[in-house]
């Protein structure tokens, strides 16, 4: 806190800088509401020490981070805004005239879109003896080891799975077959991380 106070005082002494507030970010995709209570306590402590040094921020930006359900989006299409805002109303100690800012972009629009893509190819890897290869013709003793669906969208369209293995639900919009098979869904980009 002492470093922050010194930095703010330096900013306030500069003629072309106007200090207006603090910004706190505790992470992304947070689903445990108790984390926001802890954040409020930290901010309250920060505001107390700032006030002791005659610094009263006009703006308190609490960041975002409110998670959405990527595993079952149809069951939870809207983030839990009610409990989220109730925590700040109850636990954040701000003064009249101070404004509280929230950054809830993903929480608001994250469930509102879909990436629609089409299958370009289906590729099957076979094990024939001790040799693994991709074949278009099968041999009686060959067994499928892995099946790939190559689609026309790639990591350039949806980078989250490539960056940090984020999960997104994949739905086949055209098949009416009740038979389920396991495939690795991959894009056309020549990178090993171009997977969904």
Residue ranges and their predicted role:
Residues 87, 96-196:
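Charged (often Lys/Glu-rich) extended helix/loop segments that serve as interaction or gating elements
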Residues 7, 43-45, 49, 82-95:
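Alpha-helix-loop-beta-strand connector modules within alpha/beta enzyme cores
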Residues 24-31, 60-67, 71-73, 105-107, ...:
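Active-site beta-loop-alpha junctions enriched in small/polar residues
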Residues 1-59, 68, 73, 120-123, ...:
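Active-site-proximal beta-alpha core segment in soluble small-molecule metabolic enzymes
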Residues 1-5, 29-41, 76-83, 106-112, ...:
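Active-site glycine- and acidic-residue-rich loops that bind
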Residues 13-16, 94, 179:
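Short, structurally constrained coil/turn elements
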């Amino acid at each position: 806190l002492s470093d922050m106070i010194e930095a703010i005082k330096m900013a306030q002494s500069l003629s072309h800088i106007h200090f207006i507030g603090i910004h706190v970010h505790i992470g992304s995709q947070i689903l445990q509401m108790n984390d926001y209570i802890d954040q409020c306590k930290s901010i309250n402590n920060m505001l107390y020490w700032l006030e002791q040094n005659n610094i009263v921020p006009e703006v308190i930006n609490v960041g975002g981070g409110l998670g959405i359900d990527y595993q079952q989006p149809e069951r939870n299409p809207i983030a839990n805004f009610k409990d989220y805002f109730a925590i700040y109303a109850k636990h954040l100690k701000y003064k009249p005239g101070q404004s509280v800012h929230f950054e809830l972009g993903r929480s608001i629009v994250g469930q509102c879109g879909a990436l629609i893509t089409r299958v370009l190819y289906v590729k099957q890897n076979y094990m024939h003896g001790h040799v693994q290869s991709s074949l278009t013709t099968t041999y009686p003793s060959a067994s499928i080891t892995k099946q790939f669906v190559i689609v026309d969208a790639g990591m350039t369209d949806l980078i989250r799975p490539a960056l940090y293995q984020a999960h997104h639900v994949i739905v086949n919009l055209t098949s009416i077959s009740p038979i389920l098979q396991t495939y690795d869904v991959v894009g056309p980009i020549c990178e090993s991380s171009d997977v969904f």
